[in-house]
Design a protein with these regions (language model features):
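Active-site-proximal loop/turn and secondary-structure-junction residues that shape catalytic pockets
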Residues: 81, 134-136, 176-178
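Glycine-rich, histidine-containing beta strand-loop boundary motifs that form or position
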Residues: 65, 132, 174-176
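A residue-level signal for conserved active-site and pocket-lining positions in enzyme catalytic cores
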Residues: 75, 130, 177
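Active-site His/acidic residue clusters
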Residues: 124-157
C-alpha cells in the first residue's frame, strides 16, 4: 500500500525521493494494522446485508467467481464473514495459471458463463451473485489490447447471460465493484 511509502521509516520497496513532512495522515479505512494512521471510516460489523437478508427470506443464492474475485462474492459480500448463509451455494472456478493475465484475457469468464447458463435454464437459484474478474484484472496490467479483448469477452458473456435470463423469466442487475 502507498501508505507504507509515506509512513514507514524503513520502507525500501522503491526509491521515495524527497519525503514531505506530514502534519497528519488519515486513511479511508484500516488496510493493515501496522500502518500508524488515523482511520476515517473504521471497520464496522455488517448486519442484515443482502446475503443475510436473502437467507432470512429462505431464498436460494449462488455465489460464483473465479479465484481472483471469489472473496468478493463470498467473504466481502457477506460483510467480512467467511461462513456461508443458509441456502447459499458457492462455486469457485479456478483462474488460469499464467504469469500475467494479458496472456489469457478471457481468464475463466467462459467457464463461469457456461455454469451460469445451465443454472439459469434449470431455474436453480432465486438470486445469482457473480463477479467477472477480467475487466479489473486486465485493466491493472496496463495492456490496452488485452484489456479490450477482456471487455469484448465479457460483452459476449453478458449477452448470452441476459438472453438466457430473458428467455427463462429472470432479471438482472449489472454493476461494477469499482
Amino acid at each position: 500500500q502507498i501508505s507504507h511509502a509515506f509512513l514507514d521509516t524503513k520502507f525500501s520497496a522503491f526509491k521515495r525521493g524527497a519525503q514531505p513532512r506530514l502534519g497528519d495522515f488519515i486513511s479511508l479505512t484500516e488496510y493493515a494494522t501496522d500502518i500508524p494512521s488515523h482511520i476515517a471510516f473504521p471497520l464496522q460489523s455488517l448486519k442484515n446485508g443482502l446475503g443475510e437478508y436473502l437467507a432470512q427470506q429462505n431464498l436460494s443464492q449462488l455465489r460464483i467467481a473465479e479465484t481472483e474475485k471469489y472473496a468478493h462474492v463470498t467473504f466481502f459480500f457477506n460483510g467480512g464473514e467467511e461462513l456461508a448463509f443458509a441456502n447459499e451455494t458457492r462455486v469457485l472456478i479456478p483462474s488460469k495459471k499464467v504469469a500475467t493475465y494479458d496472456l489469457t484475457p478471457q481468464m475463466s469468464a467462459l467457464e463461469i458463463t457456461q455454469h451460469l447458463l445451465v443454472d439459469i435454464k434449470e431455474k436453480k437459484y432465486d438470486v445469482i451473485i457473480c463477479n467477472f474478474a477480467n475487466p479489473d484484472m486486465l485493466g491493472h496490467t496496463g495492456e490496452l489490447q488485452a484489456t479490450l479483448q477482456a471487455i469484448s469477452c465479457i460483452d459476449q458473456c453478458m449477452g448470452e447471460i441476459t438472453a438466457s435470463l430473458k428467455q427463462h423469466g429472470g432479471e438482472a442487475i449489472i454493476t461494477a465493484d469499482h
